[in-house]
């Protein structure tokens, strides 16, 4: 509905794009069942972690790498909440120490539009940000074609299908509960992105 997601916002399995997100959702449902039976559970939900040590890299990290390589000719109008991975680690420990049993906490910082993120990356890297905004409806079939091409050639896909699917939802959150109750650090997204860019550069990703 365009509002901010909170710990109480209902979500469904159908909204989860890809096996990774679906598996996390299903695992959380099982944990919630155990919580109702008395298991002392505190749940944390990180937004979009970025920073050092992103070896695979994650979908968000791959987006940064593709930008650094100048392979981001266009963008989709969507939103994300970037959080420093070190703050996420701290948030897990703080949840263990201070979290209330049976509660969940969104670990995040500032809500940004994707264009804002690319503007920050452009300043950090000197790479021109994409100037063309494309509708998700156009990108989605291209992502499927790109995935099929990847299966045939073995070349990793350039258009992340799961990311395009998730772009349907503006991933903006109200993170005040974790700030208020846990005291999670709030490293600015600009700093988190700078750490990610430096790490990817130093380790030969871009």
Regions found by a protein language model. Give the residues of each.
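Short aromatic-enriched loop/helix-cap "lid" or pocket-rim segments at secondary-structure transitions
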Residues: 1-3, 54-58, 119, 143-146
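Catalytic helix-loop patch of NAD(P)-dependent Rossmann-fold dehydrogenases
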Residues: 1-43, 48, 72
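Short, hinge-like loop/turn segments at secondary-structure boundaries
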Residues: 3-8, 59-63, 148-151
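Substrate-positioning beta->alpha
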Residues: 22, 26-27, 59, 76-96, ...
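NAD(P)-dependent short-chain dehydrogenase/reductase
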Residues: 38-43, 47-81
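Short aromatic/basic micro-patch
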Residues: 43, 82, 111, 172
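Mid/C-terminal beta-alpha module of Rossmann-like enzyme folds, strongest
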Residues: 91-158, 175, 180, 190-206
């Amino acid at each position: 509905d365009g509002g901010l997601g909170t710990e109480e916002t209902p979500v469904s399995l159908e909204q989860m794009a890809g096996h990774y997100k679906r598996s996390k959702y299903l695992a959380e449902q099982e944990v919630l069942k155990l919580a109702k039976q008395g298991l002392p559970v505190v749940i944390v939900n990180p937004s979009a972690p970025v920073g050092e040590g992103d070896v695979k890299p994650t979908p968000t990290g791959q987006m940064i790498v593709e930008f650094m390589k100048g392979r981001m000719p266009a963008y989709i109008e969507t939103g994300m909440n970037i959080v420093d991975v070190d703050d996420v680690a701290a948030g897990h420990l703080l949840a263990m120490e201070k979290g209330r049993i049976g509660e969940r906490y969104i670990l995040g910082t500032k809500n940004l539009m994707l264009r804002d993120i690319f503007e920050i990356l452009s300043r950090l890297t000197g790479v021109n940000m994409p100037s063309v905004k494309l509708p998700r409806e156009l990108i989605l079939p291209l992502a499927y074609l790109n995935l099929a091409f990847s299966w045939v050639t073995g070349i990793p896909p350039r258009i992340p299908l799961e990311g395009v699917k998730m772009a349907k939802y503006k991933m903006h959150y109200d993170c005040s509960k974790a700030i208020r109750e846990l005291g999670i650090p709030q490293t600015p997204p600009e700093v988190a992105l700078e750490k990610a860019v430096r790490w990817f550069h130093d380790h030969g990703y871009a």
